[in-house]
Design a protein with these regions (language model features):
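N-terminal secretory/targeting leader peptides
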Residues: 1-27, 35-194
Length: 194
């Protein structure tokens, strides 16, 4: 399956710090660095996880809100749905937002009832939750590059004959190409929904 890799390598969560890495190319250069290669090796050693294809782009995280935001000052007092990441909460609080930890399944009604005035997600995630029905504005903050990996149990991978391993690695690369194409198309599609 796919996963946000940094959840399992919390020492490297800085790669997901808001505004730290704000474009896809830089993120992929970091992900392909020796430092992160060591992390991927630690997954195999500690968790028995095999990264089949490297990171694939899921889109840029953006803020969507019920009101137009034109400057950082406009974040002051904005009630923003946030996940439980202490790093993300503190970053948005430092910018003036009031962060409200909510699960995604509560997002729509929380915006509808005024519990929150917006959220930050990849547009596809907000879109599939029907958020465009209750907010009008997309703020192109592009504050986090959203990337996931496709992985499997490393012991199982190692037990397979070499041709099967090669087929899985090839399929992983094909899945990345397809997933990135879909991710870019979805980002454009959902941008039009607001």
């Amino acid at each position: 399956g796919s996963m946000p890799w940094w959840l399992y390598s919390t020492d490297y969560a800085w790669t997901q710090a808001p505004f730290m890495i704000t474009d896809r190319e830089t993120y992929m250069n970091v992900y392909d660095s020796d430092v992160i290669r060591q992390v991927r090796q630690s997954w195999a050693d500690e968790y028995h996880v095999k990264d089949l294809c490297g990171g694939f782009y899921r889109g840029m995280r953006k803020v969507v809100a019920t009101k137009k935001l034109e400057s950082v000052e406009d974040l002051s007092g904005l009630k923003l749905r946030m996940n439980s990441s202490a790093l993300w909460n503190s970053a948005w609080q430092a910018l003036g937002a009031v962060t409200v930890p909510l699960s995604l399944n509560e997002l729509y009604t929380s915006i509808q009832t005024g519990v929150v005035e917006g959220c930050e997600n990849p547009l596809s995630e907000s879109g599939y939750l029907n958020v465009p029905e209750v907010v009008d504005y997309v703020i192109n903050t592009d504050h986090v590059v959203e990337v996931a990996i496709i992985c499997m149990n490393n012991d199982l991978f190692e037990s397979l004959p070499a041709p099967y391993q090669e087929a899985l690695l090839k399929a992983g690369q094909e899945a990345i190409a397809w997933g990135e194409e879909q991710g870019e198309a979805e980002e454009e599609q959902w941008l039009k929904a607001y």
